Amino acid sequence: MEEGNVVRDTNRIFGVDIDNITEKEAQDITKELIEKSNKSCTFIASPNVEFVMHAQKDKEFFDILKKAKLSTPDSIGIIWAGKKLKKPFKIRIPGQRYFRLVLEMAEKEGYTVYLLGGKGDTPRLAKENVEKIYPKVKIIGYHEGYFEQDSEEEVIEEINKLKPNILFVALGAPKQEKWIIQHQKELKVDVAAGQGGTYDYEAGNIKRAPIWIQKIGMEWFWRLLKQPSRIVRMMAIPKFMLKLFFTKDITKSKWEK
């Protein structure tokens, strides 16, 4: 897949392009996007199985994912799809891991960060906790995600006043991705990336699965045990696996002729 003069190494999974990159490459590409953006709000995504399956029934979301200039592989199901394509992904980069990688890079480069999303004190607690890990990172603002439509302009105005290099948006998918694209021309940020439930983990609201569970790709099951309300969303995983197993050409989407 070619973006301008840059050829991206991607795997196409049911029409969704996902970058085949290492963690270091994810940092380097993000840095390059920031440097070239000039406050044009370059969109970054972290597609997982739920994203891919939702995109099969939501054309707007499918088209939005096509706009991402970087898409990190964020679930074990995506990794398995790469193996079926006989082009294995180099590594799985979950959303929270990408969040940490970017903060690490931002601390080193002096980039500024804004956290949008989460409930109540969650973004503040997430900010305080990650600042203990990255003491020199410049998180210059935050705002919880349960704002009313009439206060949305105030939120955007605050972000634009600060002009952060990096905007993380944690409103849940597909809302966060749609929100970024809806306001892409208004937002004076260099890059914007959806972050789902990352703030909850960073704030300590939800405990991450033990490392051994993460390594075997069963973190989704751990999350289901901790959050039974996610069961409807989690049904996307077995549906994806069946689709993966029974579909001969897994690169195509029903939206593409």
Predicted regions and their residues:
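Short glycine-rich anion-binding loops that position phosphate/pyrophosphate groups of nucleotides
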Residues: 48-52, 171-176, 198
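Conserved beta-alpha
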Residues: 79-158, 162
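Short, flexible loop segments at boundaries between secondary-structure elements
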Residues: 144-150, 190-226
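Proline-aspartate-enriched helix->loop->beta-strand connector
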Residues: 159-169, 173, 189
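A transmembrane-helix-recognition feature enriched in membrane-embedded lipid enzymes
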Residues: 77-82, 209-257
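A short, gly/pro- and small-residue-rich
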Residues: 59, 63-67, 177-195
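N-terminal nucleotide/polyanion-binding subdomain common to many enzyme families
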Residues: 2-91
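Conserved acidic residues
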Residues: 69, 113, 140, 165, ...
